[in-house]
Design a protein with these regions (language model features):
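Proline-centered turn/helix-capping motifs that create local helix->coil transitions or kinks
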Residues: 36, 100-104, 141-143
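Conserved short histidine dyad/triad with adjacent acidic residue
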Residues: 112-127
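Short helix-to-loop capping/linker segments positioned immediately adjacent to catalytic or ligand/cofactor-binding
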Residues: 98-102, 120-123
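Non-heme Fe(II)/2-oxoglutarate
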Residues: 1-99
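Eukaryotic charged/polar low-complexity linker/IDR segments
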Residues: 133-134
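A short glycine-rich, His/Asp/Glu-containing loop-to-beta-strand
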Residues: 100-115
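Catalytic core of Fe(II)/2-oxoglutarate
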Residues: 129, 139-212
Length: 212
């Protein structure tokens, strides 16, 4: 796990080689399962796809919110291994010197799996949480182009690499540029996967020692 802290133009963290081989095996078992028909659903207004105030869809991909999919967290490989983001007293966050990460307190998080193929994108938006962590995964060799993350207010682009995690304040505007894939690689699970974790402080939930 290679952690790099950034301070400009806003505080963020990039972690390369985020998951180890054993964790990746567990994650890919679930991703392959989720790619069966009817598991990951096309983003629509009814399925929870983000939209503009006038009803235009921002999200053009396939997705599923895992917390609502499983009755128990330990039924999901992904929901179990992604706890490492909050482990050891928020060690990943606290090692960053920014006030944002030093003072971060959350007691609730949700996980979404997204999948992008030809022409899929996510137009510029903000997330309704405090902190967002995006982990990108794809099968190698890479069979698509595009799909990088843009932060238009800061003229910044974050490149998508396999097993890379990008952690940043949720109120920063961000989007995904369109993905391009040759026809022979479509519908083969060879696109861009993104595991999104959204953390926030829910004042109705008592803070536990693990969230200090």
């Amino acid at each position: 796990m290679e952690i790099k802290n950034f301070y400009e133009p806003f505080p963020y963290i990039i972690i390369d080689t985020y998951y180890n081989d054993a964790e990746l095996t567990l994650i890919w078992e679930e991703l392959n399962f989720l790619c069966y028909p009817s598991k990951l659903r096309r983003a629509t207004a009814k399925s929870g796809g983000a939209q503009t105030p006038d009803g235009q869809l921002l999200k053009l991909n396939y997705h599923s919110y895992l917390d609502g999919l499983y009755a128990f967290r330990d039924m999901s490989n992904i929901l179990m291994v992604n706890r490492k983001l909050f482990g050891n007293g928020y060690e990943i966050f606290r090692q960053h010197d920014s006030w944002f990460f030093k003072n971060l307190h959350i007691n609730k998080d949700n996980t979404q799996v997204g999948y992008y193929e030809e022409n899929d994108e996510y137009k510029t938006h903000i997330d309704s949480s405090t902190i967002t962590a995006l982990t990108w995964l794809y099968k190698t060799p890479k069979r698509f182009t595009g799909g990088d993350l843009i932060l238009p207010d800061y003229d910044t682009e974050i490149k998508v690499y396999n097993n890379r995690t990008f952690i940043f304040p949720s109120f920063i505007k961000h989007g995904v540029i369109p993905v391009s894939m040759k026809e022979q690689y479509r519908n083969t699970k060879s696109g861009r996967f993104c595991i999104s974790q959204f953390g926030q402080l829910d004042m109705s939930i008592p803070m536990s020692p693990t969230h200090d």
